[in-house]
């Protein structure tokens, strides 16, 4: 960032008074430009004993499988964002139910919120960001072709909870440790 979005003046990267980290600061108008984590919202779309996955048509992780999810937009709730992302990526309409998982990914400044959801019908197809969209039972899931560790972790917990009759909110941190991604419970 080079210029202030409020007044157009050049900005400086420094620690503002009363803060503990460097921020982009405009000395002309006093605006402090904060850069905060992004919220990623998505669904675990269920149909009978199967869930809907999307094969990515974009980078990162082109060609790998994921749940329909993406960045939350201004002016929408997390549930609305999850439903919108499912419609965009899988052309699927869902009833968004309870929040299933919340994972912090501090190494990429993201927070994932994934909701259990019910497919309203079997009318789905790849959206612009998907190569393919399919329903999978647990035994059919291409575990070695999952796009992101957070999705693989969420699905592992989901199927374990479903088999055991559990369903409490799952939360944790997925952090990079020496090139490895590991999950730690909060």
Predicted regions: what is each one?
Residues 1-42:
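Acidic, metal-coordinating catalytic segment for phosphate/diphosphate chemistry
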Residues 3, 23, 44, 53, ...:
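Conserved hydrophobic/aromatic beta-strand scaffold that supports enzyme active sites
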Residues 5, 12, 27, 52, ...:
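Nucleotide phosphate-binding site architecture
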Residues 21, 36-40, 46-48, 60-62, ...:
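Short connector loops at helix/strand junctions that flank enzyme active sites
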Residues 28, 56, 69, 117, ...:
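Active-site donor-binding loop signature of nucleotide-sugar glycosyltransferases
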Residues 46-88:
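Conserved Nudix-box catalytic region and its N-terminal flanking loop in Nudix hydrolases
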Residues 72-157, 161, 166-168, 180-186:
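Unchanged
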Residues 171-178:
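Short, highly charged C-terminal tails/helix-capping segments
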């Amino acid at each position: 960032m080079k210029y202030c979005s409020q007044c157009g003046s050049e900005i400086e990267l420094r620690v503002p008074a009363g803060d503990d980290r460097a921020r982009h600061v405009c000395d002309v108008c006093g605006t402090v430009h904060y850069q905060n984590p992004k919220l990623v919202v998505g669904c675990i779309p269920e149909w009978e004993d199967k869930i809907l996955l999307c094969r990515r048509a974009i980078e990162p992780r082109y060609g790998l499988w994921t749940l329909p999810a993406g960045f939350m937009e201004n002016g929408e709730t997390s549930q609305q964002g999850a439903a919108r992302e499912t419609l965009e990526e899988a052309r699927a309409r869902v009833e968004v139910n309870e929040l299933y998982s919340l994972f912090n990914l501090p190494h990429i400044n993201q927070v994932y919120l994934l909701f259990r959801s019910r497919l309203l019908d079997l009318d789905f197809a790849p959206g612009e960001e998907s190569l393919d969209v399919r329903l999978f039972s647990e035994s059919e899931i291409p575990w070695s072709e999952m796009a992101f560790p957070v999705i693989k972790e969420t699905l592992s917990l989901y199927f374990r909870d479903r088999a055991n009759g559990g369903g409490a909110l799952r939360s944790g941190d997925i952090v990079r440790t020496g090139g490895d991604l590991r999950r730690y419970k909060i």
